[in-house]
């Protein structure tokens, strides 16, 4: 699938060049549009640990879940030519948001389907989340009523969490789930950060009927570079992982109404996912100064859903 999509995008310039050679090429420096919107972000990000000595099975997973974090989103697009557009957009959380984290371990190799240790941290905060996207679009069809094109771009996104307090159930001294308790309220447990960097390719289109306009896009990357930083404050240990060549999928749809010839109000929804893949981890012990590096023991995953309402203006 990766090579097929890449082939389609790479052959698009041939069609665009043919279109340009017909004499339709012209600069349109005045055709610039901007939009701003407000909305919410919900989703889940996951970190995993695998044991290569036990066939690479999963031995730990932390799920960081967030819901309805307020975001602000903006974009600017320049129709450089009738068949070529440049764009930049991004979004950011407006403030931190309450979230939830669950940490589970499967440490019994003889009963791999049953967790042995679990801690729950309902007092978790999504400290921040943000993203920027730079892209270029080539229009195969570009008419007042409809557009269809291919695009390529570069995108980065970041997430930061902090878990405090919570409860736990541990299996200690060879027993099973025999120790239960709670962490002091406000005590820092784990701090976690994720970062995703990726080039991508995709398709984009829109259709207008009278004052109504509908649009959508699909983006794909098989070249995601993910990294994370996991701080275990009580143990004074830091885990830093890197994963390469993960898959990314994004689907977005919008609907709008032109209140004036240049201004449109719109609603938009997007679903985004970065699939799990194994990577490498470096461990740093701040108590002793020791460090270690292991291959194929980490897993990083993220998915989210975003809804926004906004205003677009074309100059």
Feature locations, PLM:
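Gram-negative bacterial Sec-dependent N-terminal signal peptides
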Residues: 1-20
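Outer-membrane beta-barrel biogenesis signature
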Residues: 19-37
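Transmembrane beta-barrel strands of outer-membrane/channel proteins
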Residues: 32-42, 88-94, 150-158, 205, ...
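Extracellular/periplasm-exposed beta-strand and loop segments of Gram-negative cell-envelope proteins
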Residues: 43-69, 92-132, 157-196, 221-252, ...
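Post-signal peptide N-terminal segment of secreted/secretory-pathway proteins
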Residues: 73-77, 81, 85-87, 93
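Residues on the lipid-exposed face of transmembrane beta-strands in outer-membrane beta-barrel proteins
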Residues: 74-78, 132-138, 152-154, 201-207, ...
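Repeated loop/turn-to-beta-strand initiation elements of outer-membrane beta-barrel proteins
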Residues: 82-88, 143-146, 211-214, 262-265
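Short gly/pro-enriched beta-turn/loop segments at secondary-structure junctions
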Residues: 194-200, 207-213, 246-248
């Amino acid at each position: 699938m990766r090579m097929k999509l890449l082939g389609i995008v790479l052959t698009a310039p041939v069609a665009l060049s043919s279109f340009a050679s017909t004499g339709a090429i012209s600069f349109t420096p005045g055709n610039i549009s901007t939009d701003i919107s407000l909305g919410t972000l919900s989703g889940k990000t996951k970190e995993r640990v695998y044991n290569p000595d036990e066939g690479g099975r999963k031995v730990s997973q932390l799920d960081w879940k967030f819901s309805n974090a307020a975001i602000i989103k903006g974009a600017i697009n320049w129709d450089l030519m009738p068949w070529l557009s440049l764009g930049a957009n991004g979004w950011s959380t407006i403030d931190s948001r309450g979230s939830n984290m669950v940490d589970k371990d499967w440490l019994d190799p003889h009963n791999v389907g049953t967790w042995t240790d679990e801690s729950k941290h309902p007092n978790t905060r999504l400290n921040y989340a943000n993203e920027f996207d730079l892209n270029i679009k080539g229009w195969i069809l570009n008419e007042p009523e409809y557009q269809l094109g291919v695009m390529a771009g570069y995108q980065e996104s970041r997430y930061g969490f902090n878990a405090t307090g919570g409860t736990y159930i541990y299996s200690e001294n060879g027993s099973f789930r025999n120790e239960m308790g709670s962490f002091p309220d406000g005590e820092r447990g784990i701090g976690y950060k994720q970062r995703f960097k990726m080039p991508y390719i995709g398709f984009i289109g829109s259709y207008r009927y009278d004052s109504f306009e509908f649009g959508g896009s699909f983006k794909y990357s098989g070249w995601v570079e993910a990294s994370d930083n996991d701080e275990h404050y009580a143990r004074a240990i830091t885990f830093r992982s890197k994963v390469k060549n993960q898959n990314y999928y994004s689907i977005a749809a919008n609907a709008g109404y032109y209140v004036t010839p240049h201004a449109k109000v719109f609603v938009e929804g997007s679903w985004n996912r970065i699939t799990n893949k194994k990577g490498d981890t470096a461990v740093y012990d701040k108590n002793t100064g020791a460090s270690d590096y292991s291959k194929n023991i980490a897993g990083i995953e993220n998915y989210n859903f975003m809804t926004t309402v906004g205003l677009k203006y074309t100059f």
